[in-house]
């Protein structure tokens, strides 16, 4: 949420990029996929957004170290973790996700040079045919947030 109650153009662009990654990531979490495969796919979503924002280049991606992809410069943490008896519950990195599992989806973009960081977090329940957004009632669009901040 912007402290001033209104996004600058740059804040809005970065916020919307994070929101697109979050929404894309939510559709990827489904029964049968492993967290490892999921994180690779989310990395691809984030890479596209960071290129579009001018934060990394296609050349950097082509020459990246697979152990530390180019997107890690601005998105250095994981995208999701299990939620259960504990906030960061235990789960298996290589085992397929199952219906009934609950996960966070929490992408972020951090631009140290601009003193700008945006992270969104959502919680979802995996179902047999998709997911239930456990935080679907919370406004996420930039315009909705600005309207809420205006009171």
Q: What are these language model-derived features?
A:
Residues 1-151:
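Active-site neighborhoods and metal-handling regions in enzymes and metal-associated proteins
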């Amino acid at each position: 949420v912007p402290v001033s109650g209104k996004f600058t153009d740059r804040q809005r662009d970065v916020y919307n990029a994070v929101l697109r990654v979050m929404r894309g990531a939510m559709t990827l979490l489904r029964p049968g996929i492993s967290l490892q495969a999921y994180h690779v796919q989310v990395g691809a979503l984030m890479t596209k957004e960071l290129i579009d924002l001018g934060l990394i280049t296609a050349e950097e991606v082509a020459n990246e170290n697979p152990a530390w992809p180019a997107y890690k410069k601005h998105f250095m943490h994981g995208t999701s973790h299990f939620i259960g008896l504990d906030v960061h519950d235990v789960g298996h990195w290589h085992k397929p996700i199952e219906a009934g599992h609950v996960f966070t989806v929490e992408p972020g973009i951090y631009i140290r040079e601009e003193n700008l960081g945006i992270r969104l977090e959502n919680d979802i329940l995996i179902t047999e045919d998709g997911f239930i957004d456990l935080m679907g009632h919370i406004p996420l669009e930039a315009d909705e947030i600005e309207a809420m901040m205006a009171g």
